[in-house]
């Protein structure tokens, strides 16, 4: 059961306290539980949506979107920014690409990729809520 808790701790900000430091094998097995953690996150977001369904669609979409980012700690957005920066900045140079990915700062392409993905996620959440409410 440790791999599940490792996955939940890694992919969310939920206060999961592991009794020991995970082994490489346990970390590898944790990947198998990523879909389940995604289902849990989706379930929480769905539950919040159902509870506050009477709110205006725009407000509810903003709440759900913010909760989604908060629950995951923005982990995927950080990875997206690193990848976008490295892909554009290190184009054709593998060593430069890896250097850019390790750099803690975020370049303009990284910021732009986050903005675009966040706008799309927010718009899609809004459309889903609006269609359900009508």
Please identify what each model-predicted range represents.
Residues 73-79:
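Juxtamembrane membrane-interface segments at transmembrane alpha-helix termini
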Residues 1-73, 89-96, 103-134:
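Hydrophobic alpha-helical transmembrane segments
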């Amino acid at each position: 059961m440790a791999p599940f808790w490792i996955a939940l701790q890694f992919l969310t900000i939920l206060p999961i306290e592991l009794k020991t430091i995970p082994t490489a094998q346990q970390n590898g097995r944790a990947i198998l539980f990523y879909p389940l953690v995604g289902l849990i996150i989706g379930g929480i977001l769905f539950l919040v949506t159902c509870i506050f369904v009477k709110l205006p669609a725009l407000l509810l979409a903003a709440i759900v979107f913010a909760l989604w980012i908060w629950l995951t700690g923005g982990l995927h957005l950080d990875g997206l920014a690193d990848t976008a920066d490295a892909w554009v900045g290190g184009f054709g140079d593998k060593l430069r690409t890896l250097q850019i990915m390790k750099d803690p700062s975020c370049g303009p392409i990284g910021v732009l990729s986050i903005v675009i993905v966040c706008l799309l996620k927010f718009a899609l959440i809004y459309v889903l809520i609006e269609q359900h409410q009508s």
